[in-house]
């Protein structure tokens, strides 16, 4: 016999739960690396999402919303970077940003 719970609603933990933190490693494939134009495209993509996104390389971490920060990473062709996102749309942000990087920032070189 199961206990009668009446009209007591199930607890809602969504407001107290922390948003997920996800990360993904990707490699810069384009000839000129993460230069100004590529960094600008990356920032514009990152700004579409609510999640906080960081880019890490060689122990240095910068905001995905900072063109100068991204360029200061010095990520040339073949550089491995880690994308780290925290927020409710973290997976979508990582998917979109990784696709942008892996496509060579849509550059023709």
Identify the function of each model-found stretch:
Residues 1-25:
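SAM-dependent methyltransferases
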Residues 19-23, 48, 78:
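A general secondary-structure signal for short beta-strands and their flanking turns/coil
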Residues 20, 69-71, 92, 98:
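Intrinsic-disorder/low-complexity peptide segments enriched for small residues
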Residues 76-109:
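C-terminal structural segments of small proteins and small subunits
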């Amino acid at each position: 016999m199961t206990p009668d719970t009446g009209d007591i609603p199930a607890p809602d933990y969504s407001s107290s739960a922390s948003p997920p933190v996800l990360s993904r490693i990707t490699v810069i494939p384009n000839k000129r690396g993460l230069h100004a134009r590529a960094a600008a495209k990356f920032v514009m993509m990152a700004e579409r999402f609510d999640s906080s996104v960081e880019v890490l390389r060689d122990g240095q971490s910068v905001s995905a919303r900072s063109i100068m920060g991204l360029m200061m990473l010095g990520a040339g062709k073949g550089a491995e970077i880690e994308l780290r996102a925290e927020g409710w749309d973290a997976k979508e942000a990582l998917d979109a940003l990784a696709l942008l990087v892996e496509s060579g920032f849509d550059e023709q070189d």
